[in-house]
Protein backbone atom coordinates (compact mmCIF):
# COMPACT_ATOMS: atom_id res chain seq x y z
CA UNK A 1 0.00 0.00 0.00
CA UNK A 2 1.54 3.30 -1.09
CA UNK A 3 0.62 6.95 -0.57
CA UNK A 4 -0.58 7.15 -4.18
CA UNK A 5 -3.16 4.43 -3.50
CA UNK A 6 -4.69 6.54 -0.75
CA UNK A 7 -4.40 9.82 -2.66
CA UNK A 8 -6.29 8.56 -5.70
CA UNK A 9 -9.23 7.17 -3.74
CA UNK A 10 -12.44 9.20 -3.89
CA UNK A 11 -15.60 8.66 -1.84
CA UNK A 12 -18.79 8.03 -3.81
CA UNK A 13 -22.41 9.11 -3.40
CA UNK A 14 -24.42 5.93 -3.84
CA UNK A 15 -28.12 5.29 -4.29
CA UNK A 16 -29.44 2.84 -1.68
CA UNK A 17 -30.83 -0.52 -2.70
CA UNK A 18 -34.28 -1.43 -1.42
CA UNK A 19 -37.07 -3.93 -1.27
CA UNK A 20 -40.63 -3.84 0.02
CA UNK A 21 -41.69 -6.00 2.94
CA UNK A 22 -45.44 -6.23 3.52
CA UNK A 23 -46.04 -2.63 2.44
CA UNK A 24 -42.91 -1.09 4.02
CA UNK A 25 -39.86 -0.05 2.00
CA UNK A 26 -36.53 -1.15 3.46
CA UNK A 27 -33.36 0.66 2.35
CA UNK A 28 -29.81 -0.64 2.69
CA UNK A 29 -26.38 0.45 1.49
CA UNK A 30 -25.51 -1.25 -1.83
CA UNK A 31 -22.55 -3.57 -2.44
CA UNK A 32 -19.74 -3.75 -1.45
CA UNK A 33 -21.65 -4.17 1.86
CA UNK A 34 -23.75 -6.98 3.32
CA UNK A 35 -26.90 -4.84 3.13
CA UNK A 36 -28.20 -6.91 0.23
CA UNK A 37 -28.34 -9.97 2.51
CA UNK A 38 -30.83 -8.26 4.83
CA UNK A 39 -33.09 -7.46 1.88
CA UNK A 40 -32.79 -10.99 0.51
CA UNK A 41 -33.74 -12.45 3.89
CA UNK A 42 -36.85 -10.30 4.00
CA UNK A 43 -37.80 -11.21 0.43
CA UNK A 44 -37.52 -14.90 1.31
CA UNK A 45 -39.47 -14.49 4.56
CA UNK A 46 -42.31 -12.64 2.84
CA UNK A 47 -43.28 -16.02 1.38
CA UNK A 48 -44.25 -17.23 4.86
CA UNK A 49 -46.97 -16.06 7.32
CA UNK A 50 -44.53 -14.78 9.93
CA UNK A 51 -47.14 -12.86 11.94
CA UNK A 52 -49.41 -15.89 12.19
CA UNK A 53 -46.53 -18.16 13.18
CA UNK A 54 -45.80 -15.91 16.16
CA UNK A 55 -42.86 -13.98 17.54
CA UNK A 56 -39.78 -16.06 18.41
CA UNK A 57 -41.59 -19.37 18.05
CA UNK A 58 -39.71 -22.40 16.76
CA UNK A 59 -41.53 -22.10 13.42
CA UNK A 60 -40.57 -18.45 12.96
CA UNK A 61 -36.99 -18.74 14.19
CA UNK A 62 -36.37 -21.75 11.96
CA UNK A 63 -37.47 -19.78 8.90
CA UNK A 64 -35.26 -16.82 9.84
CA UNK A 65 -32.22 -19.02 10.42
CA UNK A 66 -32.69 -20.88 7.14
CA UNK A 67 -33.30 -17.64 5.22
CA UNK A 68 -30.11 -16.24 6.75
CA UNK A 69 -28.08 -19.18 5.45
CA UNK A 70 -29.44 -18.78 1.92
CA UNK A 71 -29.04 -15.00 1.76
CA UNK A 72 -25.51 -15.03 3.15
CA UNK A 73 -24.47 -17.84 0.80
CA UNK A 74 -25.54 -15.74 -2.19
CA UNK A 75 -23.93 -12.61 -0.77
CA UNK A 76 -20.58 -14.34 -0.24
CA UNK A 77 -20.60 -15.78 -3.73
CA UNK A 78 -21.68 -12.63 -5.59
CA UNK A 79 -20.73 -9.47 -3.68
CA UNK A 80 -17.48 -7.55 -4.00
CA UNK A 81 -16.39 -4.14 -5.27
CA UNK A 82 -19.10 -3.11 -7.78
CA UNK A 83 -16.53 -1.09 -9.74
CA UNK A 84 -14.57 -4.25 -10.49
CA UNK A 85 -17.14 -7.04 -10.43
CA UNK A 86 -20.55 -7.50 -12.00
CA UNK A 87 -22.99 -7.97 -9.13
CA UNK A 88 -26.48 -9.14 -10.17
CA UNK A 89 -28.32 -6.97 -7.64
CA UNK A 90 -31.59 -6.91 -9.58
CA UNK A 91 -31.69 -10.70 -9.84
CA UNK A 92 -30.68 -11.21 -6.22
CA UNK A 93 -33.53 -8.93 -5.07
CA UNK A 94 -36.18 -10.24 -7.47
CA UNK A 95 -39.36 -11.81 -6.12
CA UNK A 96 -38.94 -14.75 -8.47
CA UNK A 97 -35.52 -15.54 -7.05
CA UNK A 98 -36.73 -15.11 -3.46
CA UNK A 99 -39.63 -17.47 -4.09
CA UNK A 100 -37.27 -20.09 -5.51
CA UNK A 101 -34.96 -19.75 -2.51
CA UNK A 102 -37.92 -19.94 -0.11
CA UNK A 103 -38.99 -23.19 -1.75
CA UNK A 104 -35.63 -24.71 -0.75
CA UNK A 105 -36.46 -24.34 2.95
CA UNK A 106 -37.64 -27.50 4.66
CA UNK A 107 -39.92 -26.17 7.39
CA UNK A 108 -39.18 -29.18 9.60
CA UNK A 109 -35.45 -29.69 9.10
CA UNK A 110 -32.34 -27.53 9.39
CA UNK A 111 -30.07 -27.38 6.37
CA UNK A 112 -26.43 -27.71 7.39
CA UNK A 113 -24.65 -27.24 4.05
CA UNK A 114 -25.31 -24.08 2.05
CA UNK A 115 -22.23 -21.89 1.70
CA UNK A 116 -19.19 -22.80 -0.43
CA UNK A 117 -16.49 -23.99 1.97
CA UNK A 118 -13.79 -21.81 0.41
CA UNK A 119 -15.46 -18.71 1.89
CA UNK A 120 -15.62 -19.98 5.45
CA UNK A 121 -12.45 -18.14 6.52
CA UNK A 122 -14.43 -14.90 6.62
CA UNK A 123 -16.78 -16.19 9.29
CA UNK A 124 -13.84 -17.34 11.40
CA UNK A 125 -12.29 -13.88 11.67
CA UNK A 126 -12.59 -12.18 15.07
CA UNK A 127 -15.40 -9.78 15.83
CA UNK A 128 -15.14 -6.08 15.10
CA UNK A 129 -15.62 -2.83 17.00
CA UNK A 130 -18.30 -0.65 15.43
CA UNK A 131 -20.28 2.44 16.40
CA UNK A 132 -23.76 3.36 15.20
CA UNK A 133 -25.63 6.60 15.72
CA UNK A 134 -28.78 8.14 14.32
CA UNK A 135 -30.14 11.67 14.54
CA UNK A 136 -33.26 13.57 13.50
CA UNK A 137 -34.08 17.28 13.54
CA UNK A 138 -37.18 19.49 13.56
CA UNK A 139 -36.99 20.01 9.79
CA UNK A 140 -37.52 16.35 8.98
CA UNK A 141 -33.91 15.44 8.28
CA UNK A 142 -32.82 12.01 9.50
CA UNK A 143 -29.33 10.49 9.48
CA UNK A 144 -28.38 6.83 9.85
CA UNK A 145 -24.62 6.50 10.33
CA UNK A 146 -22.30 3.61 11.07
CA UNK A 147 -18.51 3.49 11.19
CA UNK A 148 -15.77 1.04 12.03
CA UNK A 149 -12.04 0.58 11.56
CA UNK A 150 -12.76 -3.16 11.83
CA UNK A 151 -10.70 -5.10 14.38
CA UNK A 152 -9.65 -3.41 17.62
CA UNK A 153 -7.62 -0.33 16.66
CA UNK A 154 -7.85 -1.37 13.02
CA UNK A 155 -4.45 -1.89 11.46
CA UNK A 156 -2.78 -0.30 14.47
CA UNK A 157 -1.17 2.24 12.15
CA UNK A 158 -1.67 5.94 12.83
CA UNK A 159 -1.07 8.41 10.02
CA UNK A 160 1.65 10.75 11.37
CA UNK A 161 0.35 14.11 12.45
CA UNK A 162 -3.32 13.19 12.04
CA UNK A 163 -4.37 11.07 15.01
CA UNK A 164 -6.57 8.73 12.95
CA UNK A 165 -6.04 4.99 12.74
CA UNK A 166 -6.08 3.17 9.42
CA UNK A 167 -8.56 0.30 9.20
CA UNK A 168 -7.82 -3.32 8.30
CA UNK A 169 -10.93 -4.21 6.31
CA UNK A 170 -8.73 -5.93 3.77
CA UNK A 171 -8.95 -8.95 6.06
CA UNK A 172 -12.37 -9.64 4.54
CA UNK A 173 -11.03 -10.37 1.05
CA UNK A 174 -10.87 -13.97 -0.11
CA UNK A 175 -7.66 -15.42 -1.55
CA UNK A 176 -9.62 -17.75 -3.83
CA UNK A 177 -9.09 -16.72 -7.44
CA UNK A 178 -11.95 -15.65 -9.65
CA UNK A 179 -14.41 -14.55 -6.97
CA UNK A 180 -16.16 -11.18 -6.77
CA UNK A 181 -14.38 -10.60 -3.46
CA UNK A 182 -10.93 -11.90 -4.48
CA UNK A 183 -8.15 -9.67 -3.15
CA UNK A 184 -6.83 -7.22 -5.73
CA UNK A 185 -5.33 -3.76 -6.25
CA UNK A 186 -7.52 -0.65 -6.03
CA UNK A 187 -10.34 -2.84 -4.81
CA UNK A 188 -12.73 -2.58 -1.87
CA UNK A 189 -13.60 -5.76 0.05
CA UNK A 190 -17.02 -7.03 0.97
CA UNK A 191 -17.62 -5.51 4.39
CA UNK A 192 -20.09 -5.61 7.23
CA UNK A 193 -21.23 -2.13 8.26
CA UNK A 194 -24.74 -1.14 7.15
CA UNK A 195 -27.01 1.70 8.31
CA UNK A 196 -30.69 1.14 7.58
CA UNK A 197 -33.90 3.03 6.74
CA UNK A 198 -37.49 1.81 6.88
CA UNK A 199 -40.49 3.69 5.53
CA UNK A 200 -44.23 3.42 4.98
CA UNK A 201 -45.86 6.59 3.71
CA UNK A 202 -44.81 9.44 5.98
CA UNK A 203 -43.68 7.12 8.78
CA UNK A 204 -39.89 6.83 8.64
CA UNK A 205 -37.44 4.86 10.77
CA UNK A 206 -33.67 5.10 10.89
CA UNK A 207 -31.95 2.12 12.45
CA UNK A 208 -28.69 0.26 12.71
CA UNK A 209 -27.41 -2.72 14.65
CA UNK A 210 -23.70 -3.14 15.31
CA UNK A 211 -22.17 -6.60 15.38
CA UNK A 212 -20.00 -7.65 12.44
CA UNK A 213 -21.64 -10.31 10.26
CA UNK A 214 -24.60 -10.29 12.63
CA UNK A 215 -25.86 -7.00 11.18
CA UNK A 216 -27.90 -8.13 8.17
CA UNK A 217 -29.64 -10.92 10.10
CA UNK A 218 -30.32 -8.50 12.97
CA UNK A 219 -31.73 -5.93 10.52
CA UNK A 220 -34.18 -8.53 9.23
CA UNK A 221 -35.26 -9.38 12.79
CA UNK A 222 -35.73 -5.69 13.66
CA UNK A 223 -37.81 -5.02 10.53
CA UNK A 224 -39.99 -8.05 11.20
CA UNK A 225 -40.51 -6.96 14.80
CA UNK A 226 -41.85 -3.61 13.56
CA UNK A 227 -43.77 -4.79 10.50
CA UNK A 228 -45.04 -8.25 11.45
CA UNK A 229 -45.50 -7.81 15.18
CA UNK A 230 -46.20 -4.09 15.59
CA UNK A 231 -43.42 -3.43 18.08
CA UNK A 232 -42.31 0.12 18.83
CA UNK A 233 -38.66 0.85 18.09
CA UNK A 234 -37.50 0.20 21.66
CA UNK A 235 -39.24 -3.17 21.83
CA UNK A 236 -38.06 -4.03 18.33
CA UNK A 237 -34.45 -3.49 19.42
CA UNK A 238 -34.69 -5.17 22.83
CA UNK A 239 -36.64 -8.25 21.74
CA UNK A 240 -34.67 -11.47 22.12
CA UNK A 241 -32.68 -12.38 19.01
CA UNK A 242 -30.72 -15.23 17.50
CA UNK A 243 -27.40 -14.98 15.74
CA UNK A 244 -25.65 -17.40 13.45
CA UNK A 245 -21.99 -16.46 13.34
CA UNK A 246 -20.88 -19.10 10.84
CA UNK A 247 -21.99 -19.14 7.21
CA UNK A 248 -22.58 -22.88 7.11
CA UNK A 249 -23.51 -25.68 9.48
CA UNK A 250 -26.45 -25.94 11.87
CA UNK A 251 -25.00 -24.00 14.81
CA UNK A 252 -27.02 -21.06 16.13
CA UNK A 253 -26.94 -18.93 19.27
CA UNK A 254 -30.09 -17.80 21.09
CA UNK A 255 -30.61 -15.42 23.97
CA UNK A 256 -32.10 -17.14 27.01
CA UNK A 257 -35.23 -14.96 26.88
CA UNK A 258 -36.37 -17.04 23.92
CA UNK A 259 -38.89 -19.57 25.28
CA UNK A 260 -37.62 -23.06 26.08
CA UNK A 261 -40.39 -24.51 23.92
CA UNK A 262 -38.97 -22.66 20.90
CA UNK A 263 -35.44 -23.81 21.71
CA UNK A 264 -36.55 -27.44 21.91
CA UNK A 265 -38.49 -27.04 18.67
CA UNK A 266 -35.32 -25.87 16.92
CA UNK A 267 -33.27 -28.72 18.34
CA UNK A 268 -35.89 -31.17 17.11
CA UNK A 269 -35.36 -29.74 13.61
CA UNK A 270 -31.61 -30.38 13.81
CA UNK A 271 -30.33 -26.96 14.90
CA UNK A 272 -27.32 -27.10 17.22
CA UNK A 273 -28.53 -24.49 19.70
CA UNK A 274 -26.28 -22.68 22.16
CA UNK A 275 -27.94 -20.32 24.62
CA UNK A 276 -26.06 -17.20 25.69
CA UNK A 277 -27.54 -14.75 28.22
CA UNK A 278 -30.77 -12.72 28.47
CA UNK A 279 -29.25 -9.64 26.83
CA UNK A 280 -26.14 -10.68 24.92
CA UNK A 281 -24.07 -8.33 22.77
CA UNK A 282 -23.23 -11.22 20.44
CA UNK A 283 -26.64 -10.77 18.76
CA UNK A 284 -25.92 -7.11 17.97
CA UNK A 285 -26.53 -3.74 19.54
CA UNK A 286 -28.80 -1.15 17.97
CA UNK A 287 -30.33 2.31 17.93
CA UNK A 288 -33.38 3.63 16.10
CA UNK A 289 -35.54 6.72 15.59
CA UNK A 290 -39.11 6.73 14.29
CA UNK A 291 -40.75 9.85 12.87
CA UNK A 292 -44.50 9.39 12.54
CA UNK A 293 -46.79 11.03 9.98
CA UNK A 294 -47.37 13.95 12.36
CA UNK A 295 -43.66 14.61 12.78
CA UNK A 296 -43.50 13.22 16.32
CA UNK A 297 -40.19 11.51 17.11
CA UNK A 298 -39.75 8.26 19.05
CA UNK A 299 -36.32 6.81 19.78
CA UNK A 300 -34.94 3.53 21.07
CA UNK A 301 -31.54 2.39 22.31
CA UNK A 302 -30.56 -1.24 22.76
CA UNK A 303 -30.03 -2.34 26.37
CA UNK A 304 -27.26 -4.72 25.29
CA UNK A 305 -24.68 -1.93 25.08
CA UNK A 306 -23.76 1.51 26.32
CA UNK A 307 -25.81 4.24 24.63
CA UNK A 308 -29.08 6.08 25.03
CA UNK A 309 -31.85 7.95 23.27
CA UNK A 310 -31.36 11.65 24.00
CA UNK A 311 -33.77 14.48 23.09
CA UNK A 312 -32.13 17.84 22.55
CA UNK A 313 -33.81 20.92 24.00
CA UNK A 314 -35.06 23.27 21.28
CA UNK A 315 -32.98 26.39 20.71
CA UNK A 316 -34.53 29.58 22.17
Predicted regions and their residues:
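Alpha-helical support elements that line or immediately flank enzyme active sites
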Residues: 209-231
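Internal maturation/activation junctions in enzymes
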Residues: 47-149, 161-162, 169, 272, ...
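Accessory "access/gating" subregions that flank catalytic or transport cores
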Residues: 1-32, 102-113, 117, 122-125, ...
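Active-site rim segments in enzyme catalytic domains, especially the processed small/beta chain
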Residues: 2, 141-205, 229, 233
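Short, small/polar residue-rich loop motifs at catalytic or cofactor-binding pockets
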Residues: 13, 127-130, 191-193
